[in-house]
Every structure is written in structure tokens, then in C-alpha cells.
């Protein structure tokens, strides 16, 4: 969607400001819930702000040996922005009206693609580890 919209913008005769957005919003918490639900894990969130943590509530996936009640996520102060606006929603109406752009990719589809790809990567990492090889982490 994003690349398609950029291409459409480049086809216009005059430069203008454009908002590339779906007009929908989701919380980080709901995004995390979607990701874990994709692999059959339900989370329970406790606390607020910097003290918020996620715990394993249930799991229907036998591949993962997850302990019910185990803390698996917590807010990282490095990324927490207490003064952040509560709700951010981009307005794509100009792009829809002037260019006929309508997003085709849903958040659910993105989560599905992302989680499927990450699971394949983690299987590869596990295979290497079990074979006695070290795998480097090039990410934060």
C-alpha cells in the first residue's frame, strides 16, 4: 500500500503534501495481542505505563512450551513516551479523493505475514543452534 501510494504521488503534476494512512488505529497492546494470537497464545496485561507487563494467560499451541502466568513482556523505558498523544490517526481522505487510493492491506494480513516469516526465521535459528552453530543477532 505504501509503495503503491508513493508511486501514485509521483505521477501527479504538482508537488503536494500527502498523508499515507489507513484512517484506522490500534494500540501497541492490541498489536501484541494479535501477534501472539496468531501462534495460539493469549496474554494478560497488568499494570499501567512503565509498570505494564504481559503474562501468558493460555496457549493452544503445543509447539511452544510456555508456562501459564509467566511474564514475557514489559514496557521498556527507552521507548516509553508519557507525553505522547493518546490517539494518532492519519487522514487519507485527500489521497482517496484526488488519487483514488484505497488501502488493500489490512493490519491482520500484515500480522499474519510478519508472524509467519518470523516463525520460519526462528525455526532456522533453532536448527542452527541445535547443530552447534552460532547465530549472530544484527538487530537491537
Predicted regions and their residues:
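C-terminal substrate-binding subdomain of Rossmann-fold SDR/epimerase-dehydratase oxidoreductases
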Residues: 1-140
Amino acid at each position: 500500500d505504501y509503495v503503491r501510494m508513493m508511486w501514485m504521488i509521483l505521477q501527479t503534476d504538482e508537488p503536494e503534501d500527502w498523508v499515507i494512512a489507513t484512517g484506522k488505529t490500534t494500540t501497541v497492546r492490541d498489536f501484541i495481542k494479535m501477534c501472539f494470537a496468531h501462534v495460539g497464545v493469549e496474554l494478560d496485561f497488568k499494570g499501567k505505563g512503565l509498570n505494564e507487563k504481559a503474562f501468558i494467560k493460555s496457549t493452544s499451541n503445543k509447539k511452544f512450551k510456555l508456562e501459564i502466568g509467566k511474564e514475557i513482556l514489559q514496557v521498556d523505558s527507552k521507548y516509553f513516551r508519557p507525553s505522547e498523544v493518546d490517539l494518532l490517526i492519519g487522514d487519507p481522505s485527500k489521497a482517496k479523493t484526488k488519487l483514488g487510493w484505497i488501502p488493500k492491506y489490512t493490519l491482520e494480513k500484515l500480522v499474519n505475514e510478519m508472524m509467519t516469516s518470523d516463525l520460519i526465521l526462528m525455526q532456522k535459528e533453532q536448527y542452527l543452534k541445535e547443530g552447534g552453530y552460532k547465530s549472530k543477532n544484527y538487530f537491537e
